[in-house]
Swiss-Prot record:
Lineage summary: Bacteria, Pseudomonadati, Pseudomonadota, Alphaproteobacteria, Hyphomicrobiales
UniProt subunit comment: Monomer.
SUPFAM superfamilies: Peptidyl-tRNA hydrolase-like
Annotated site residue numbers, Stabilizes the basic form of H active site to accept a proton: D91
Protein name: Peptidyl-tRNA hydrolase
The keyword Transmembrane belongs to this UniProt entry's keyword annotation: no
GO cellular component: cytoplasm
GO molecular function: peptidyl-tRNA hydrolase activity; tRNA binding
EC number: 3.1.1.29
Localization annotation: Cytoplasm
Protein's job: Hydrolyzes ribosome-free peptidyl-tRNAs (with 1 or more amino acids incorporated), which drop off the ribosome during protein synthesis, or as a result of ribosome stalling. Catalyzes the release of premature peptidyl moieties from peptidyl-tRNA molecules trapped in stalled 50S ribosomal subunits, and thus maintains levels of free tRNAs and 50S ribosomes.
Spans annotated as Disordered: 199-227
Length: 239
């Protein structure tokens, strides 16, 4: 059995927050594959199912983000699982919107839900980091993370969630590169480019550096002297 945990905050007021994209991933997997109805257990919503030959337990902690490890740890111990049997889906500020990266172990990157799981389960589990982008200013991080996805975001978010759900078999069988590739293809050309504030886009085919250079004035040809005589011989001239 593998335990797939999606992180977020419980309650309808949080359901569209960027911080809840882990819940959204779990919901997409639930819809795409055959699972039992959600039930309350381990301070979480849980559903059992199977993808291919692998039995799965979907977990959505209902403890609020900062205590996610309580629910995941309790489920891990109940089913006598190891940290290596756990896959966690969560939001990542330091990835551009629509980017997905899978890694095993390492630090929390400042994510409180991951800190909590590290404390209760150790660090040797796989993390599916789902990019939500950084607002660019530290003071805007909290309202960004705890804000709803914009309507325009669904152009990349919906196909991304669908692709992760459809290809979760690649993830559970260890083909992490294949899973990330499918996720990348799903959002190709759909995630909006983020322009630097106040910077106008370059004209097609010209770099910003090239545009910044002033045009050099045309060279003036000498009208008298030896050089003028030589040029006149080479190119001719009006008499």
């Amino acid at each position: 059995m593998l335990l797939l945990a999606g992180l977020g905050n419980p309650g309808p007021q949080y359901q569209n927050h960027r911080h809840n994209v882990g819940f959204m991933a779990a919901d997409a997997i639930f819809r795409r594959h055959s699972f039992s109805p959600w039930s309350k257990k381990f301070s979480a919503l849980v559903a059992e199912g199977r993808v291919g030959t692998e039995k799965l337990l979907l977990v959505k902690p209902q403890t609020f983000m900062n205590l996610s490890g309580q629910a995941v740890g309790e489920a891990m111990r109940f089913y006598k699982l190891q940290p290596s049997d756990i896959i966690v889906f969560y939001d990542e500020l330091d990835l551009a919107p629509g980017k997905v990266r899978v890694k095993r172990g390492s630090g929390s990157g400042g994510h409180n839900g991951i800190k909590s799981i590290d404390a209760h389960c150790g660090q040797d589990y796989r993390r599916v980091r789902i990019g939500i982008g950084h607002p660019g200013d530290k003071a805007r991080v909290t309202p960004h993370v705890l804000g709803d996805f914009a309507k325009a975001d669904h152009a990349w978010l919906d196909p991304l969630l669908d692709a992760m759900a459809e290809n979760v078999d690649l993830l559970i069988t260890g083909d992490e590169s294949g899973f990330m590739n499918k996720a990348s293809l799903a959002v190709q050309g759909k995630a909006a480019d983020i322009e630097m504030a106040g910077e106008k886009p370059a004209q097609k085919g010209r770099s910003h550096i090239r545009q910044a250079r002033p045009k050099a004035p045309p060279a003036e040809l000498p009208s008298s002297g030896p050089m003028a005589a030589m040029l006149k011989k080479l190119f001719g001239g009006k008499e």
